[in-house]
């Protein structure tokens, strides 16, 4: 108050000395009846920089009508109020419950809660559940502005997290294969707030050295989320002691790694009283996972955050929004079959993933330069900027394949951006621009059409789209017969499958009751996803076990998915 000469309240001015000497303080705790509050708010304007309605403006309305009463509190400690985020965080801890109480109330999580108590003691904590996910249509495109059609599965990553007084995050895992880890959230510089600044931080020598020292550590996914949330929100987050349990198969295309990111974000949000929109949450999670070296989108994180039990949810990106949810009818089942071929982003495959993303970028840069009359803001816009023939012509106008040196010659005005993209992956020799771009625009159309097909119960057509979609990732085997004209019937060549996964899809597509099958997840290993007639699900699983798993001497790893709710916090 010393820096203020006067303060104006309800048309009266008070000097700083008067304010400092007053025995009365407005604690900003107001009690209304609902009808009166609604009426008062309707009289308040929003003519301010934020365009907001202020609750305090209602006081003047009630005062004019003689309807204000003041309650004097003799003991300030009896007030439950706060003025800052730090005070709110401190208050919220009083409402947390001990782990032993959580153990009694949530017996389904008894294993991880008991492990938490054993490692950290019977402390006040929260439980966070972040499920795995499957994407029925819309692979490799959400970072280009495409949409996804997703559902969460029952397998999940579960955190039991207790707040700390410092900014240290300590991690322990029920599975002894994952060693304990610890780091300080405050290591990342505070001035990193925008996406561009975050990318610059990730490409810094300091970050590269940190990653090289901890390459392959499961804790890097937690670290990436914590760093990104702390920097973007410009708030000193409290640390936490965490016990983790995961039931999502690792490196199987069901997003076990992204579930660590989402669980971290949910736990930090709960313990720090963060208030974010779904869009903010999803975008920061997607960017947080870039810390491990990948440059994918936020589709997996969005699926985990926004899924709805019993439904397939349509999600849009750039900007993010939640679209239509379609209930899965009892006539259909979704089966996931693990190929038992792992794809680990930290062990080299990230170069291949990032090279595909780079091919999208390069194709888009060249198409925009070639067709300046088109309004193209995101890669997605190519798919809807003309007729089928026009779009094919646009794609054919750029080099089918191109090297880095050729790109630098063709785009001399973009050398800085090109070098920035080159730095995300090893040089593949040449980039398949046409195959990648054709897959992208066709998958964008398929994903956009998916809710209508599902809502109209056109499952045979949807299954055909799944087969074509997989052909865009296929590296071997027999592509599906092309049965129509239009972008949705094109497959392109993203080529992130494997011979084993292709063989599994071919086996399933020849099985009675299977409507369609495709690669699940980013690829280079992982699972196959199938849409199946429900009354044939048992026979499909039988053939899977006998003709795939048993024949290859692999553990039987297929299951029927039950669509579950998205991420949750249990207090």
Q: Which residue ranges define each predicted feature?
A:
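A short glycine-threonine-serine/GTX helix/turn-capping micro-motif
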Residues: 16-31, 45, 79, 324-325, ...
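Conserved core of the sugar-phosphate nucleotidyltransferase
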Residues: 1-49, 56, 63-67, 73
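Glycine- and acidic-rich phosphate- and metal-coordinating loops
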Residues: 201-208, 226-227, 234-248
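Phosphate-handling active-site elements
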Residues: 232-239, 268-284, 534-547, 551-552
């Amino acid at each position: 108050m010393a820096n203020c000469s006067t303060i104006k309240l309800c048309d009266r001015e008070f000097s700083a000395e008067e304010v400092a000497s007053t025995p009365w303080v407005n604690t900003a705790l107001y009690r209304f009846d609902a009808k009166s509050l609604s009426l008062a708010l309707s009289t308040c304007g929003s003519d301010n920089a934020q365009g907001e309605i202020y609750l305090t403006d209602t006081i003047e309305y009630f005062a004019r009508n003689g309807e204000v009463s003041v309650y004097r509190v003799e003991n300030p400690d009896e007030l439950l109020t706060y003025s800052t985020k730090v005070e709110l965080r401190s208050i919220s801890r009083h409402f947390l419950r001990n782990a032993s109480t959580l153990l009694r109330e949530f017996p389904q999580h008894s294993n991880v809660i008991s492990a938490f108590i054993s490692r950290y003691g019977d402390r006040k904590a929260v439980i966070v559940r972040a499920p795995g996910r499957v994407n029925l249509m819309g692979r490799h495109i959400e970072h280009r502005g495409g949409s996804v059609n997703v559902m969460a599965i029952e397998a999940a990553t579960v955190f039991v997290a207790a707040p700390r007084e410092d900014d240290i995050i300590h991690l322990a895992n029920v599975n002894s294969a994952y060693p304990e880890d610890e780091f300080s959230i405050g290591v990342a510089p505070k001035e990193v707030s925008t996406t561009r600044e975050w990318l610059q931080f990730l490409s810094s020598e300091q970050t590269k050295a940190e990653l090289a020292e901890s390459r392959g550590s499961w804790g890097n996914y937690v670290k990436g989320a914590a760093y990104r949330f702390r920097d973007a929100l410009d708030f000193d987050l409290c640390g936490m002691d965490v016990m983790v349990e995961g039931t999502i198969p690792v490196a199987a295309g069901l997003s076990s790694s992204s579930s660590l990111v989402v669980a971290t974000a949910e736990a930090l949000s709960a313990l720090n009283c963060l208030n974010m929109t779904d869009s903010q949450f999803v975008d920061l999670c997607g960017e947080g996972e870039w810390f491990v070296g990948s440059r994918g989108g936020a589709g997996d994180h969005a699926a985990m955050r926004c899924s709805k039990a019993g439904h397939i949810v349509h999600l849009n990106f750039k900007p993010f929004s939640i679209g239509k949810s379609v209930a899965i009818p009892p006539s259909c089942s979704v089966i996931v079959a693990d190929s038992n071929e792992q794809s680990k982003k930290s062990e080299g495959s990230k170069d291949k993933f990032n090279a595909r993303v780079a091919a999208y970028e390069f194709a888009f840069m060249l198409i925009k330069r070639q067709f300046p009359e088109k309004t193209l803001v995101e890669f997605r816009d190519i798919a809807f900027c003309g007729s089928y023939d026009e779009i094919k012509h646009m794609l054919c106008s750029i080099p089918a394949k191109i090297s880095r040196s050729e790109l630098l010659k063709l785009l001399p005005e973009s050398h800085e951006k090109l070098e920035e993209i080159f730095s995300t992956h090893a040089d593949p020799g040449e980039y398949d621009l046409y195959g990648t771009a054709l897959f992208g625009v066709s998958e964008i159309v398929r994903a956009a059409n998916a809710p209508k097909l599902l809502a109209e119960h056109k499952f045979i057509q949807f299954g055909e789209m799944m087969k074509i979609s997989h052909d865009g990732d296929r590296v071997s085997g027999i592509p599906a017969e092309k049965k129509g004209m239009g972008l949705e019937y094109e497959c392109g060549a993203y080529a992130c499958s494997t011979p084993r996964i292709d063989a599994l899809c071919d086996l399933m597509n020849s099985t009675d009751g299977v409507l369609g099958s495709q690669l699940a997840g980013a690829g280079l290993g992982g699972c196959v996803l199938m849409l199946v007639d429900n009354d044939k699900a048992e026979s499909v699983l039988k053939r899977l076990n006998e003709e795939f798993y048993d024949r290859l001497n692999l553990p039987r790893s297929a299951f029927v998915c039950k669509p579950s709710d998205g991420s949750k916090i249990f207090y």
